[in-house]
Amino acid sequence: KDSSWLPEARGRAVKIVAQLLPGLPADPALGYRIVFMERPFEEVLPSQRKMLGRLGEQGAELPDEKLRDVFAEQVRRVRRILAARRIPTLAVAYRDCVADPAAVAARVNAFLGGQLDEAAMAVAVDPALHRNRADGEPLPAMPA
């Protein structure tokens, strides 16, 4: 809700959960870009459930299928908003980051202007941190 910190974050990466992206100001002068990390629902839901539980939200008690449906609709809504606002957004599959970090680093670097150290970006990926692995369905696609 308070995005007054955003101008000070210029030139930095900031992790923001998808549900909070619509709260970012729609001011083109800020010039921010979004790298939207995509993961299969089955990998995302356990952490979503934990977060909802910590916040005391009712969604923590929903059955997996219902929570998945709610989360999928939230992601679709966020993507529609980003597309409508014409915020530059690059969709990146988490699995691709783990499987081929150099290729993903090159894509992200190109998207962000080409001034980043791709080798350092690729080396920073630690496949051992890939928790909650699943072979499930990915998040809904970005709108064209």
Which residues does each PLM region occupy?
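PAPS-dependent sulfotransferase catalytic core
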Residues: K1-D2, M121-A144
